[in-house]
Design a protein with these regions (language model features):
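Short, structured surface patches at the beginning of a domain
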Residues: 1-145
Length: 145
């Protein structure tokens, strides 16, 4: 049997920012949810780029059923809508469970005890994650102006 892992993804845009600042919070959340052994990926790279070395490594190494744990959607993506859809496709293709620390419905979904609750939370999460990804992209565009 393959043991499930939690792949913590930490990203900051510049070397001046501390990508690891949220590590303890994410490790604590992982432990509280009992998700599995942690593997940490730290990246200082723009969230507007789909092709990121550590994110690619994470997706390459991930196994079906592993958890991808991020602090917030904007740490995962500031991508265009098309690129974000591609990233979501890759995450789903690998069979990763996306858990977002500041989006409690993502971890409520994995704790759901019945299929109806799970399905409802999955729909809510998909909508919220898409909305938050769009807001992260718009926020990035405003900063550039």
């Amino acid at each position: 049997m393959i043991e499930m892992n939690t792949r913590i993804y930490l990203r900051a845009s510049t070397k001046d920012q501390d990508a690891k600042r949220a590590l303890q919070i994410l490790q604590d959340l992982n432990q509280n949810l009992n998700l599995g052994e942690t593997i940490v990926y730290v990246e200082n790279y723009s969230g507007t780029k789909l092709d990121r070395p550590e994110l690619n490594k994470l997706l390459s190494e991930a196994n079906q059923g592993d958890t991808l744990l991020v602090e917030s959607i904007d740490r995962l993506s500031r991508l265009t809508q098309r690129d974000f859809q591609e990233l979501k496709r890759r995450i789903q293709e690998k069979g990763l469970r996306l858990v977002v620390a500041d989006l409690p419905t993502t971890y409520q979904m994995i704790q759901a005890s019945d299929s109806i609750t799970h399905s409802i939370l999955e729909l809510i999460n998909n909508m919220l994650i898409d909305l938050l990804a769009t807001m992260a992209r718009l926020d990035n565009e405003k900063r550039i102006e």
